[in-house]
């Protein structure tokens, strides 16, 4: 089932004549009006923003779900405990069904802790003193069938609650914040196409925060899924972009801003736990910010490479995956004996299509199929070397050899001359070479430069 479109919800005030040893229920002067305010228009006393149930559902679903609220006449019972499976509650539910409602919420007085909902059923129960998050969670249980995904007794991997997705997901801690991208997708509030599926070794992604309206704009994704089978990782951006992700008078909002990474550990479409594992295992109790990274026990690295007011950029690297054809690898060498290994992927693909590649200083030079000379900047960090500067407008594919040293580019022309070009790294044509070798340079087996020296291997 899914909460899509507008659902008719009956809110039934329930007064208990027996509450001992708890204090007696005190009926508010305008109980019906108070319920309707909580359902449809409930300005926060601190911020003034609407934190009603309807505002939350519309925001969390990006307008896919809505509700029509009706407050029914008060019901009176002469007992303290009211359970959803009690005979009179089931009879009440049937009367609401007969009137065309999609769900009914029994609204009680007294202290918090009454919140419950029939997963995929019809009835929810909560009290007036419970916060928006509880009202939303219990009705989401009813109308989506989705379960609680918090840590529970008997789970083997909660680590004292540190790994609980907690206040990053409404369906874990009922704090009135947005659900994760995983949960939104499960209840059809987020299209699967909004979540990128990472394949191969390395890839970069621009994240659109989960709390903003979905789907994301072109070029961005709501989350990245890493892995095709359970368990798999998810990475998403969280920012305090609205009244539900931000703190309010009564609820804390999300714990931190940045990128969170969590492991999905259940195949159940409605989030039920399996094998005594928490459904969502949080790898980042504090969200990652620019420059920070996390590495999973399966050698999946997620690095935040940049931030902006409307999201984050991340780099995902599966360090156990083979390198992809056409990637550019960067190896470090400190000059000591041993194998130069553990390369960094600095070009994600397409580098095999160039007709020539060489490096000088902190620049990488490439000759494309049109004979242009491209200059790329590289600081040696993981990421995609991109956005080249065209420093040679054409004809560079005609040289017999190309190499660089410092800020000089050397080329051997068809006549065997060695030409020296200057490059400041700025856009423009590298031209007006100096002839530094008058002939015979095409006869060498290899040519390269280091510092202010040129080296040649004779045949």
Name each model-derived stretch.
Residues 16-19, 110-113, 149, 176-177, ...:
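Acidic glycine-/aspartate-rich tracts in secreted/extracellular proteins
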Residues 103, 108-249:
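Extracellular hydrolytic enzyme modules, especially secreted metalloproteases
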Residues 27-53, 261-265, 332-352:
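Short, flexible N-terminal segments of the mature chain
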Residues 320-459:
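Trp/Gly-enriched beta-strand/coil motifs that build multi-repeat beta-propeller-like domains
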Residues 5, 163-165, 253-255:
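A short, structural micro-pattern
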Residues 15-26, 46, 119-129, 206-321:
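Non-catalytic C-terminal accessory/binding modules of secreted extracellular proteins
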Residues 1-139, 154, 206, 211, ...:
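Zn2+-dependent metallopeptidase catalytic core
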């Amino acid at each position: 089932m899914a909460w899509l479109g507008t659902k008719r919800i009956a809110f039934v005030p329930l007064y208990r004549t027996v509450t001992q040893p708890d204090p007696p229920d005190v009926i508010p002067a305008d109980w019906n009006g108070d319920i309707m305010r909580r359902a449809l228009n409930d300005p926060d006393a601190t911020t003034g923003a609407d934190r009603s149930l309807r505002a939350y559902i519309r925001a969390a679903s990006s307008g896919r779900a809505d509700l029509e609220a009706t407050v029914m006449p008060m019901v009176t019972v002469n007992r303290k405990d009211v359970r959803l499976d009690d005979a009179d509650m089931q009879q009440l539910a049937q009367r609401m069904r007969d009137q065309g409602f999609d769900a009914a919420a029994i609204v009680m007085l007294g202290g918090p802790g009454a919140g419950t909902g029939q997963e995929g059923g019809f009835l929810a129960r909560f009290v007036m003193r419970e916060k928006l998050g509880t009202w939303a969670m219990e009705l989401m249980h009813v109308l989506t069938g989705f379960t609680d995904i918090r840590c529970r007794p008997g789970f083997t991997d909660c680590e004292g609650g540190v790994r609980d997705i907690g206040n990053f997901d409404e369906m874990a801690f009922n704090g009135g914040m947005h659900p994760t991208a995983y949960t939104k997708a499960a209840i059809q509030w987020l299209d699967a196409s909004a979540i990128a599926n990472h394949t191969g070794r390395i890839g970069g992604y621009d994240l659109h925060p989960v709390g903003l309206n979905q789907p994301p704009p072109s070029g961005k994704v709501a989350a990245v899924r890493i892995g095709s089978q359970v368990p798999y990782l998810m990475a998403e951006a969280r920012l305090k972009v609205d009244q539900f992700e931000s703190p309010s008078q009564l609820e804390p909002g999300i714990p931190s801003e940045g990128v969170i990474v969590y492991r999905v550990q259940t195949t159940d479409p409605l989030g039920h736990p399996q094998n005594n594992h928490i459904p969502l295992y949080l790898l980042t109790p504090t969200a990652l910010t620019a420059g920070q990274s996390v590495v999973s026990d399966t050698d999946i690295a997620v690095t935040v490479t940049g931030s902006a007011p409307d999201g984050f950029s991340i780099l995902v690297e599966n360090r156990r995956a083979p390198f992809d054809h056409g990637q550019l690898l960067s190896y470090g060498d400190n000059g000591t004996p041993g194998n130069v290994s553990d390369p960094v992927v600095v070009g994600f693909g397409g580098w095999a299509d160039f007709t020539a590649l060489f490096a000088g200083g902190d620049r990488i030079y490439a000759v494309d199929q049109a004979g242009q000379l491209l200059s790329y900047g590289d600081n040696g960090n993981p990421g995609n070397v991109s956005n080249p500067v065209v420093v040679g407008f054409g004809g560079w594919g005609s040289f017999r050899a190309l190499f660089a040293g410092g800020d000089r580019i050397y080329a051997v022309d068809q006549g065997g001359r060695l030409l020296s070009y200057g490059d400041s790294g700025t856009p423009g044509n590298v031209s007006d070479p100096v002839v530094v070798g008058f002939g015979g340079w095409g006869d060498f087996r290899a040519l390269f430069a280091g510092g202010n020296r040129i080296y040649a291997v004779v045949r």
